[in-house]
């Protein structure tokens, strides 16, 4: 029987959890850290605020958010892969970040009340969910009026020549890296599939607006290999 997208993604991340951080650095040539740092600068996270990191994986962005909100703030990381969360919990415990809570849950049904968080992020996770728009609407639902919804994700480069090289890299080279470093050719083939079919920057910006967000900002990284999208939930009338 053919697996659903949700089942396949779950299997992928359960299997690659122990090598995920290393492979992130290999695949992006360490650029993912710089992309996240610049995204955090643009977000301008306020101390004492409350944040949710959806599809938090091994909790790298969750930890960055926790450091930004400080001990008086609160950060919740949510992921549906228990193995990925297990890696994240080890990091959080090592850093003694008491303001962090990691939860096993589904991005399609966020287990929170409306208007709960000041910031809701999703990093390299939106392309893996069954329904992009549904998850964006869920993120918009749980963010407070005036709060920010942020997505950092792979994108579709538009520069001629570079785009072709990017496609070749993701289709042929990245799965080989997966086989070499993580013994997971099949799983990293899935990651290139999900990246290749993900909406481009303009299309995702339109989706942010359709989800109910305004003042949408788009920031491309490394010739459009990745991009940040940030939208604000309208203030209550």
From Swiss-Prot:
- UniProt cross-references to InterPro entries, sorted A to Z: MenG_heptapren, SAM-dependent_MTases_sf, UbiE/COQ5_MeTrFase, UbiE/COQ5_MeTrFase_CS
Which Gene3D superfamilies does this chain map to? Vaccinia Virus protein VP39 (3.40.50.150)
Alphabetically, which GO biological process terms does the record hold? menaquinone biosynthetic process; methylation
Q: Name one GO molecular function term.
A: demethylmenaquinone methyltransferase activity
Q: Where does S-adenosyl-L-methionine bind?
A: 58, 79, 106-107
Highest taxon of source: Bacteria
Q: In which pathway does it act?
A: Quinol/quinone metabolism; menaquinone biosynthesis; menaquinol from 1,4-dihydroxy-2-naphthoate: step 2/2
Task: Give the reactions, separated by semicolons, that this protein catalyses.
Answer: a 2-demethylmenaquinol + S-adenosyl-L-methionine = a menaquinol + S-adenosyl-L-homocysteine + H(+)
Its EC number is: 2.1.1.163
- Identify the keywords attached in UniProt to this record, alphabetized: Menaquinone biosynthesis, Methyltransferase, S-adenosyl-L-methionine, Transferase
Q: Which CDD domains match?
A: AdoMet_MTases
Briefly, what is this protein's role? Methyltransferase required for the conversion of demethylmenaquinol (DMKH2) to menaquinol (MKH2).
What HAMAP family does its record include? MenG_UbiE_methyltr
Q: Which family does it belong to?
A: Belongs to the class I-like SAM-binding methyltransferase superfamily. MenG/UbiE family.
**Protein name from the UniProt record:** Demethylmenaquinone methyltransferase
What organism is this sequence from? Bacillus cereus (strain ATCC 10987 / NRS 248)
């Amino acid at each position: 029987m053919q697996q659903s997208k949700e089942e396949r993604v779950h299997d992928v991340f359960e299997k690659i959890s122990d090598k995920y951080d290393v492979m992130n650095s290999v695949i992006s040539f360490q650029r993912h850290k710089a992309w996240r740092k610049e995204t955090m600068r643009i977000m301008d996270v306020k101390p004492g605020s409350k944040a949710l990191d959806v599809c938090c994986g091994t909790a790298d962005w969750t930890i960055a958010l926790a450091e930004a909100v400080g001990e008086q703030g609160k950060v919740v990381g949510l992921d549906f892969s228990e193995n990925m969360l297990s890696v994240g919990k080890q990091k959080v415990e090592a850093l003694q970040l008491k303001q962090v809570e990691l939860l096993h849950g589904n991005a399609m049904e966020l287990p929170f009340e409306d208007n709960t968080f000041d910031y809701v992020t999703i990093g390299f996770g939106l392309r893996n969910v069954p329904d992009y728009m549904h998850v964006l609407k869920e993120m918009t639902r749980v963010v407070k009026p005036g709060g920010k919804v942020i997505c950092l994700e792979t994108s579709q480069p538009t520069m001629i020549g570079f785009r072709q090289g990017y496609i070749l890299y993701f289709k042929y080279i990245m799965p080989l890296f997966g086989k070499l470093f993580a013994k997971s050719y099949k799983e990293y083939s899935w990651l290139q599939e999900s990246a290749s079919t993900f909406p481009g920057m303009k299309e995702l910006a339109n989706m942010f607006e359709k989800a109910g967000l305004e003042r949408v900002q788009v920031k491309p990284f490394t010739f459009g290999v990745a991009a940040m999208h940030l939208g604000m939930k309208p203030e209550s009338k």
